[in-house]
Amino acid sequence: MRKDIHPDYRPVVFLDTTTGYKFLSGSTKSSKETIEFEGETYPLIRVEISSDSHPFYTGRQKFTQADGRVDRFNKKYGLKDANAAK
């Protein structure tokens, strides 16, 4: 087996930016941001949707404030919502 070809697998804190929920998990993702979590310092990865805010896992519909790419495009060019016209 060749050495040094696999990324480092380490504990990382994920922060759900919608709800503020934080959880510790293993990941190969890297980040320059760090956070103090349970007395230790870990790299911080920000996510828009996690198991705390996704309707499939919560069992209820939550509306998030995060706009999608289509919404940002429509706002930028002043287009009206195509679904609202129907």
From Swiss-Prot:
Keyword Membrane found: no
Coiled coil start-end: none
Keywords for this protein: Ribonucleoprotein, Ribosomal protein
Disulfide bonds: none
InterPro entries xrefs: Ribosomal_bL28/bL31-like_sf (IPR034704), Ribosomal_bL31 (IPR002150), Ribosomal_bL31_B (IPR027493), Ribosomal_bL31_sf (IPR042105)
Signal peptide as annotated in the record: none
Any one Gene Ontology cellular component term annotated for this protein: ribosome
GO molecular function term, any single one: structural constituent of ribosome
Assembly notes: Part of the 50S ribosomal subunit.
Protein name, as recorded: Large ribosomal subunit protein bL31B
